[in-house]
């Protein structure tokens, strides 16, 4: 083979990439886990990723130039995109009305990134089972905190952004598999789904799973269609980055492994035609995620800590008692059926985040998805059909049946695009029975309007005016707002002895009222009250009907008592008992 200029460029690009990556790894490995890894290391990591991608640059640009756009359908897509933007950003600071504790913790970690507290970008925010996500993911989301301000809007904006932009890869993926009308219907379903809206308006990272998986799947199927290294390389980039974000993304490699094994079994020797592009994909995933893998290797157990915590297999005795059976297979089948049932009858146990108790999918989208599922079984030998079925079953099993507290909508969110692709497939089949274009367009329009109205009603009319969400059940947001109204001159005593839900160091309170000083009182509450702190204005936060309220009246007779009720159900929430410092002398 003649060694021409093209090969020479490839050789130097490859050599540069290898040398850059070796240099990066040497720098990274020379720093012990306890040492801060500064921005120079991250910059070097980004540079070498770019150099590796240059290997397929020319071919990638050629691919982009060949893309043909149907402007008529892009104009139809624009209103859907604008609707999605509105549904995710409208009054984002106040809807949902309560600030979830995890949103508060997310905001505090993002603020820590901005303030330089967290600089080990390839380590975890917190060791253990809570917030054990890569600092790199928090750093990405912290950009929005910088842009929108250190407030709940800044925390939630990253999710709204990811949820909205997910429509772009989804539409082009749908176009690969469906007709133009089917793709539009599927895109609208994803855009207006109350389920995806809910997680696009929460300041946590679950919705980023949808964002990264859709870009990964889009370029994998573009790569399969054209046997293209650039597309597979791009898929590897998005796949590697996705692994830095939420735990729910960890099911994506499982989906792809099962799919490629099925592809090998189905195509035999023909499969080996994609070995080189597939190698590019795996190489890019490894290049991008290797720094985090090294961290996991240096800190054994950190990779699977959360998985071990939520695995139902680690709580077999508990679930044997719960389901009244000694059979593990019956437990898993019950879990599986409950997870499937959340799309039909609701009962989301994951009320800690969303908590809407109706079906996660509106009735119109659900009926269309069931039609689509039947079509998938008929066309199971097609790649897109087998992939959708693997996607569907993998998330239901690994995000539902095998986890505690199933079904939990936050763990199933990565399944939403698959379900709506099935809806588009069902719509496509129904439209095929109509003869005229006018009838097809009319039915499509009526269906899309119906789906929009149902989902809008569920989220913006029913859900946010109920106590279905955990942040709308717990009083942390109301407590934080109450303390802010009192000001920094007050010291807070949070009496936890009778109600462990009330605690001062709750993420919501610390994020919304960071300058307020306070302590949690979990025991010897009577002694704390009798000690008569006279250094500042005081406020005691205690549960309604607390036995200590009468004692406060005895010790501080001039104190003011304020009762707070949950505005969504009218139930008593908490009591604030205020004592001003200038009343101490009068009392004494």
Predicted regions and their residues:
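Membrane-embedded, hydrophobic transmembrane alpha-helices
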Residues: 1-79, 234, 255, 259-262, ...
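Transmembrane-helix motifs of polytopic, lipid-linked glycan transferases
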Residues: 157-180, 215, 219, 368-375, ...
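Catalytic lumenal/periplasmic loop and adjoining terminal transmembrane helix
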Residues: 26-33, 248-249, 429, 433, ...
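Multi-pass, polyprenyl lipid-linked donor-dependent membrane glycosyltransferases
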Residues: 157-165, 184-215, 229, 245, ...
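Transmembrane-lumen/periplasm boundary regions of multi-pass, lipid-linked membrane glycan transferases
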Residues: 95, 105-120, 125-127, 133, ...
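Transmembrane-helix signature of polytopic, membrane-embedded enzymes
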Residues: 170-192, 382-390, 441-445
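Hydrophobic/aromatic-rich transmembrane helices and adjacent perimembrane loops
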Residues: 199-200, 206-209, 251, 363-368, ...
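Membrane-interface transmembrane helices that cradle and orient dolichyl/undecaprenyl
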Residues: 26-27, 51-56, 214-234, 242
């Amino acid at each position: 083979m003649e060694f021409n200029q093209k090969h020479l460029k490839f050789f130097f690009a490859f050599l540069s990439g290898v040398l850059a990556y070796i240099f990066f790894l040497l720098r990274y490995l020379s720093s012990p886990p306890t040492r801060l890894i500064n921005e120079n290391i991250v910059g070097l990591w980004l540079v070498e990723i770019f150099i590796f991608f240059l290997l397929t640059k020319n071919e990638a640009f050629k691919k982009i130039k060949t893309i043909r756009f149907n402007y008529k359908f892009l104009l139809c897509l624009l209103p859907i995109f604008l609707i999605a933007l509105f549904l995710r950003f409208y009054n984002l600071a106040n809807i949902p009305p309560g600030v979830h504790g995890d949103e508060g913790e997310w905001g505090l970690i993002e603020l820590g990134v901005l303030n330089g507290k967290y600089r080990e970008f390839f380590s975890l925010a917190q060791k253990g089972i809570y917030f054990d996500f890569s600092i790199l993911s928090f750093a990405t989301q912290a950009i929005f905190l910088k842009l929108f301000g250190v407030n709940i809007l800044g925390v939630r904006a990253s999710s709204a952004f990811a949820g909205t932009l997910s429509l772009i890869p989804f539409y082009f993926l749908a176009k690969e598999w469906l007709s133009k009308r089917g793709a539009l219907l599927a895109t609208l379903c994803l855009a207006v789904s109350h389920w995806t809206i809910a997680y696009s308006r929460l300041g946590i990272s679950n919705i980023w799973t949808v964002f990264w998986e859709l870009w990964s799947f889009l370029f994998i199927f573009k790569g399969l269609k054209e046997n293209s290294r650039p597309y597979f390389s791009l898929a590897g980039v998005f796949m590697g980055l996705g692994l830095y974000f939420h735990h729910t993304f960890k099911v994506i490699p499982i989906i792809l492994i099962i799919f490629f094994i099925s592809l090998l079994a189905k195509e035999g020797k023909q499969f080996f035609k994609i070995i080189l592009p597939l190698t590019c994909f795996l190489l890019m995933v490894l290049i991008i995620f290797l720094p985090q893998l090294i961290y996991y290797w240096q800190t054994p157990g950190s990779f699977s800590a959360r998985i071990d915590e939520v695995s139902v297999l680690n709580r077999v005795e508990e679930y044997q008692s719960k389901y009244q059976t000694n059979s593990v297979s019956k437990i898993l089948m019950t879990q599986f059926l409950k997870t499937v049932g959340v799309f039909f009858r609701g009962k989301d146990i994951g009320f800690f985040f969303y908590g809407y108790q109706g079906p996660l999918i509106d009735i119109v989208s659900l009926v269309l998805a069931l039609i689509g599922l039947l079509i998938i079984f008929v066309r199971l030998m097609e790649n897109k059909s087998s992939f959708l079925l693997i996607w569907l079953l993998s998330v239901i099993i690994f995000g539902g049946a095998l986890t505690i507290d199933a079904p939990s909508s936050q763990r199933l969110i990565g399944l939403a695009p698959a379900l709506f692709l099935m809806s588009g497939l069902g719509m496509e089949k129904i439209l095929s029975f109509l003869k005229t274009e006018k009838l097809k367009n009319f039915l499509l329009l009526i269906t899309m309007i119906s789906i929009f109205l149902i989902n809008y009603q569920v989220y913006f009319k029913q859900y946010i005016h109920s106590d279905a969400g955990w942040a709308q059940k717990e009083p942390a947001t109301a407590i934080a707002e109450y303390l802010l109204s009192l000001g920094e001159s007050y010291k807070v005593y949070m009496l936890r002895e009778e109600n462990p839900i009330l605690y001062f160091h709750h993420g919501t309170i610390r994020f919304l009222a960071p300058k307020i000083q306070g302590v949690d009182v979990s025991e010897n509450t009577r002694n704390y009250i009798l000690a008569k702190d006279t250094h500042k204005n005081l406020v005691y936060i205690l549960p309604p009907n607390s036995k200590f309220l009468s004692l406060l009246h005895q010790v501080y007779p001039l104190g003011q008592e304020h009762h707070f009720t949950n505005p969504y159900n009218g139930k008593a929430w908490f009591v604030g008992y205020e004592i001003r410092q200038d009343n101490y002398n009068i009392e004494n």
